[in-house]
Amino acid sequence: SVGANSIRLAHYQHDQYFYDLCDEKGIVAWAEIPYITVHMEGGRENTISQMKELIAQNYNHASIICWAISNEISLQGVTEDLLENHRILNDLIHRMDKSRVSAMANLFMLETDSSLVSLPDIRGYNLYYGWYVGEMEDNDTFFDQFHKEHPDTVIGLTEYGADSVIS
């Protein structure tokens, strides 16, 4: 247990000032490229370029613990081209930065045994129990079942629904 606050800098690269604040305040940060919702064949070079830039520009920020490959990318299904692009990005992360891990935020409807979700070092799930589906307590059930099936896998809650906020 690190005992630190964390933030997911989701969906796009953020201003250097914010990364500086995370370093200064000791906030653990998840950095992510804007590879979201739908995989576009022919967009591979763009995603590679964006990942290279994200890592090169932010490598020296101590607050960053992971480089995230994508967010909810499986909305239109998992294709071989999508898988190959994720393999390339995952390998690129590990070549450019051997001190940090790769991560990905997965759509809550994606099966936990999908070949896509096992690629990065950290699996994040955007769960909307208590908003789109089910009850808020279903978050507990999901994570308990996942941990039982995958006790050595690093997992996190990367998004949750506005109506499921505990007040």
Show the residue positions of the predicted features.
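Phosphate-binding active sites in nucleotide-utilizing proteins
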Residues: G3
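Substrate-binding/catalytic cleft of secreted carbohydrate-active enzymes
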Residues: S6-S167
